[in-house]
């Protein structure tokens, strides 16, 4: 399938627009504009004798939709690094299997003798209304509403025998523009030819962003409607997308393209990255965040030598739909320990609760308190870690601690497992995740129990500012750390320096190249980011000077508002 170019000579000059960077990376291709569905749902009253046929037609559309999603999920499960995509598609399958979408729709078709498209669309509309009524406006709600739209479009498409072209069918390099890019559209995309996504609205925490990130497809979003109307005029023209800076360049000159790709090629350097300080000292190292050991070959391919700075072990349960047994865990952890790199890998204990509910255990607690409540689950995970410690060293991170007593308790339980498994020697370094304000102010005591600490910036910002974790709906502020969060990071780093305990940063902030000068100035020793962001961070590091970073950080620590921080970091 091909895309034709734009003939208007007035549109041939290089033209740049800027949105919000969602997924980092550089991509080049023709602009493909996906239009909104043109289907108009009409309300029809059916003769009584056609009602059962209409119900049969609806069941067939549901069955085809389930088959579509099941095929996508199966494909995702079979690919490295696609576990989160599979989880999202599994959630779509669960929604489409909900009795409400069968019993309620069928009941209404029979009772009112209305056509399936109209009844199904009405039911989905009611579900959307109920979501909006019970949830405040957060990116989580937006995600769920988008999931409803995605499923609704798929089923109605089958009912009306109309489907959009799959993004897996194209055979030329494209940058896809869409007002509302859905998770299943992104999941369909072939990253060999789909080189970038651009949407009118979007969020870093959205399901679409998660899919794009897993596929390593750059993504830029959030434009004004006026600017989006301008974008439509450039359908079919050559586009360069810069997911690091949020820049979209239409009709890029050859010199512009060469500059981007030359700079990108220059960052194939080993880790830790060395920053020019006059003495060429390695001030900061970059590590990878992963959800599965299937992502390890991607690290080897994209950024050789990089260690794993955060293995999010709870995603094993999401992928399996249940808690993994000791043997399954030990197999995964052994693969992690044996992966060759420049440093010791970091495994985070199961981090369940709130937005990450355990598939088979419901609890009001989260993070380490969830683990301590579910002691059997914790002991099994510690047993798997103890078994693997025979192979090599491992750093183990305890999530969401509020004080030192929780760390001491986990370590005591681990010692019990060591004693039970005779002949196994402890080969573990224990770390604490600082993501709750109480931990910031108890940091001196926490450091006494920790060989390293990791700042979880997503939750730290949420609990400090009283916001949803999905802060993208705050507009430009979603990218900007609040002065209070910057000061908290500074406090933790300063206390850790006194105890000679290394500090790493993970979360969204760690993958934002604009924040690198701040972290360098604060004295952070390691950033743990998603794999596609690592080379973008390296590119940014090549431009930095330690003295300028220190000067900037002093100004940031004096800032009093979001706006002041934004001026210093992004303008």
From Swiss-Prot:
Using the UniProt record, name the top-level EC class of this enzyme in a single word. transferase
Q: Does the keyword Cytoplasm apply?
A: yes
Q: Where found, per UniProt?
A: Cytoplasm
Extra info from the record? Answer: The reaction takes place in three steps, mediated by a phosphocarrier histidine residue located on the surface of the central domain. The two first partial reactions are catalyzed at an active site located on the N-terminal domain, and the third partial reaction is catalyzed at an active site located on the C-terminal domain. For catalytic turnover, the central domain swivels from the concave surface of the N-terminal domain to that of the C-terminal domain.
Going by the UniProt record, its keywords in alphabetical order are:
Cytoplasm, Kinase, Magnesium, Metal-binding, Phosphotransferase system, Sugar transport, Transferase, Transport
Q: Which residues bind phosphoenolpyruvate?
A: 312, 348, 458-459, 469
Q: Domain of life, per the record? A: Bacteria
User: Catalytic activity annotated for this protein?
Assistant: L-histidyl-[protein] + phosphoenolpyruvate = N(pros)-phospho-L-histidyl-[protein] + pyruvate
Question: Which SUPFAM superfamilies is this protein grouped with?
Answer: Enzyme I of the PEP:sugar phosphotransferase system HPr-binding (sub)domain (SSF47831), Phosphoenolpyruvate/pyruvate domain (SSF51621), Phosphohistidine domain (SSF52009)
Q: Which family does it belong to?
A: Belongs to the PEP-utilizing enzyme family.
Give any single GO term for biological process: phosphoenolpyruvate-dependent sugar phosphotransferase system
Query: Quaternary form?
Result: Homodimer.
Binding of Mg(2+), residues: 435, 459
Segments crossing the lipid bilayer: none
Q: What does this protein do?
A: General (non sugar-specific) component of the phosphoenolpyruvate-dependent sugar phosphotransferase system (sugar PTS). This major carbohydrate active-transport system catalyzes the phosphorylation of incoming sugar substrates concomitantly with their translocation across the cell membrane. Enzyme I transfers the phosphoryl group from phosphoenolpyruvate (PEP) to the phosphoryl carrier protein (HPr).
Active-site residues? 207, 506
Q: Report what the protein is called.
A: Phosphoenolpyruvate-protein phosphotransferase
Q: Name one GO cellular component term.
A: cytoplasm
Give the required cofactors.
Mg(2+)
Q: Name one GO molecular function term.
A: metal ion binding
E.C. code: 2.7.3.9
Q: What remark about domains does the record contain?
A: The N-terminal domain contains the HPr binding site, the central domain the pyrophosphate/phosphate carrier histidine, and the C-terminal domain the pyruvate binding site.
């Amino acid at each position: 399938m091909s895309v034709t170019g734009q003939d208007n000579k007035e549109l041939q000059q290089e033209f740049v627009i800027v949105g919000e960077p969602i997924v980092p990376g550089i991509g080049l291709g023709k602009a493909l504009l996906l239009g909104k569905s043109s289907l108009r749902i009409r309300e029809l009253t059916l003769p009584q004798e056609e009602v059962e046929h209409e119900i049969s037609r609806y069941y067939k559309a549901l069955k085809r939709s389930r088959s579509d999603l099941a095929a996508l999920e199966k494909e995702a499960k079979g690919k490295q690094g696609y576990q989160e995509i599979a989880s999202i598609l599994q959630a779509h399958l669960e929604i489409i299997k909900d009795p409400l979408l069968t019993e309620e729709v069928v009941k209404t078709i029979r009772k009112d003798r209305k056509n399936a498209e109209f009844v199904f669309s009405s039911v989905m509309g009611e579900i959307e209304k109920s979501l909006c009524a019970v949830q405040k406006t957060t990116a989580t709600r937006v995600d769920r509403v988008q999931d409803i739209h995605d499923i609704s479009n798929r089923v109605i498409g089958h009912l009306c025998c109309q489907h959009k072209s799959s993004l897996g069918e194209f055979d030329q390099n494209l940058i896809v523009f869409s007002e509302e890019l859905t998770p299943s559209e992104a999941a369909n995309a072939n990253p060999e030819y789909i080189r970038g996504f651009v949407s009118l609205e979007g969020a870093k925490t959205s399901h679409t962003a998660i899919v794009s990130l897993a596929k390593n497809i750059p993504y830029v979003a959030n434009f004004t409607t006026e600017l989006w109307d301008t974008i439509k005029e450039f359908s079919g023209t050559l586009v360069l997308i810069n997911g690091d800076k949020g820049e979209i360049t239409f009709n890029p000159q050859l010199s512009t393209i060469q500059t981007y790709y030359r700079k990108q090629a220059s960052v194939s350097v080993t880790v830790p990255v060395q920053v020019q300080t006059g003495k060429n000292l390695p001030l900061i190292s970059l590590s990878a965040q992963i959800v599965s050991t299937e992502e390890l070959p991607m690290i080897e391919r994209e950024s050789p030598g990089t260690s794993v700075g955060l293995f999010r072990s709870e995603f094993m349960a999401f992928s399996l739909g249940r808690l993994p047994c000791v043997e399954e865990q030990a197999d995964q952890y052994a693969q992690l320990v044996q992966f060759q790199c420049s440093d010791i890998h970091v495994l985070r204990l199961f981090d369940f609760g709130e937005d990450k509910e355990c598939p088979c255990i419901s609890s009001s607690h989260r993070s380490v308190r969830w683990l301590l409540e579910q002691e059997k689950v914790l002991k099994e995970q510690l047993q798997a870690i103890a078994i693997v410690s025979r192979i090599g060293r491992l750093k183990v991170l305890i999530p969401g601690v509020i004080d030192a007593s929780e760390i001491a308790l986990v370590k005591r339980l681990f010692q019990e497992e060591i004693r039970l498994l005779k002949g196994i020697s402890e080969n573990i370094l224990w770390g604490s995740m600082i993501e709750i304000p109480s931990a910031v102010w108890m940091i001196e005591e926490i450091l006494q129990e920790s060989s390293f600490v990791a700042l979880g910036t997503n939750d730290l910002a949420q609990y400090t500012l009283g916001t949803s974790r999905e802060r993208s709906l705050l507009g430009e502020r979603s990218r900007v750390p609040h002065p209070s969060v910057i000061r908290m990071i500074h406090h933790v780093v300063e206390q850790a320096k006194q105890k000679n305990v290394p500090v790493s940063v993970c979360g969204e902030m760690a993958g934002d190249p604009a924040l690198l000068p701040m972290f360098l100035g604060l004295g952070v020793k390691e950033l743990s980011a998603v794999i596609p962001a690592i080379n973008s961070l390296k590119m940014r590091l090549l431009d930095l000077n330690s003295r300028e970073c220190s000067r900037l950080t002093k100004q940031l620590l004096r800032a009093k508002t979001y706006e002041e921080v934004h001026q210093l970091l992004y303008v």
